[in-house]
């Protein structure tokens, strides 16, 4: 599959899967940044977490200092991982191939919607191993390691990754019901990655999937029993019901967007910060 058709077919799955392309070897013009800098330059990751923290605070009507650092760090990692994994899973389901080399991928550090993602044109045309597996072993692992070094539990971070994979499969299934079996099978295969062992229960890409850790976004909830995501491990526990409608058909599609509105993936952010950012 050539670069043009694959990019167009990914865009048909929704904005979370959309990618742009650029000529290999170019220096990214502003506001684009190289993905490698985010993964390997601590100051860039610190800035992103701070940006997300400010966004969470503004969305919830509170001061940035009232948002715990580890909550912002978890949400930032979730959004970044999800934005990378969605097009990779989409490409795999569509029978294409997408290589996300951190040194060649560009991104735009913006909030309030699916942030821009650009890859070299050759990244969409050269066949290779399963794109999701390579992404998990490379950039996603690097990002999880960098955030874990900032006192965020690796269990939480890999739970975020599992949730992102399941959410991407759910969105593919909603956009293309004919691809639902392939999307769920690809997600299940991705969840066999060693670091994801025990990260979730139930079939990924459906409302029956539950992660075994919490992304921590509930800590910004307006009150007890609110602000839980549809796939949260806390859903259904006494005094902590999930958000309304979490088990209705289509609820799984919202799981990703509910938590990562301010990280650049769009959608709502649970019951407590539903307003969209500018």
Put a short name on every predicted segment:
Residues 174-248:
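Cys/His-clustered metal-coordination modules, chiefly Zn-binding fingers
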Residues 249-252, 257, 263:
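Short linear motifs in low-complexity or flexible loops
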Residues 1-47:
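A eukaryotic "domain-start" boundary segment
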Residues 266, 275-278:
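Polybasic, low-complexity intrinsically disordered segments
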Residues 36-207:
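Hydrophobic, aromatic-lined core segments that form the binding pocket/scaffold
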């Amino acid at each position: 599959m050539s670069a043009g058709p694959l990019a167009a077919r990914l865009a048909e799955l929704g904005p979370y899967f959309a990618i742009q392309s650029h000529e290999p070897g170019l220096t990214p013009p502003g506001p684009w940044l190289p993905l490698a800098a985010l993964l390997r330059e601590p100051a860039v990751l610190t800035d992103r977490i701070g940006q997300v923290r400010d966004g969470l605070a503004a969305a919830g009507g509170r001061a940035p200092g009232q948002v715990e650092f580890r909550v912002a760090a978890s949400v930032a990692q979730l959004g970044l991982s999800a934005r990378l994994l969605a097009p990779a899973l989409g490409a795999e389901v569509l029978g294409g191939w997408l290589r996300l080399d951190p040194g060649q991928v560009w991104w735009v550090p913006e909030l309030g919607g699916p942030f821009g993602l650009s890859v070299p044109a050759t990244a969409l045309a050269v066949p290779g191993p399963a794109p999701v597996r390579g992404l998990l072993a490379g950039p996603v692992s690097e990002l999880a390691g960098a955030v874990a070094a900032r006192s965020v539990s690796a269990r939480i971070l890999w739970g975020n990754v599992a949730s992102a994979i399941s959410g991407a499969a759910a969105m593919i299934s909603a956009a293309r019901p004919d691809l639902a079996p392939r999307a769920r099978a690809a997600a299940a295969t991705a969840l066999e990655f060693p670091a994801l062992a025990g990260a979730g229960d139930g079939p990924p890409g459906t409302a029956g999937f539950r992660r075994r850790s919490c992304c921590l976004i509930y800590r910004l909830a307006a009150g007890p029993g609110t602000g839980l995501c549809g796939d949260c491990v806390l859903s259904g526990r006494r005094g902590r019901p999930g958000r309304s409608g979490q088990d209705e058909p289509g609820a799984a599609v919202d799981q990703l967007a509910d938590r990562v509105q301010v990280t650049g993936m769009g959608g709502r952010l649970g019951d407590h910060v539903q307003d969209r950012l500018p």
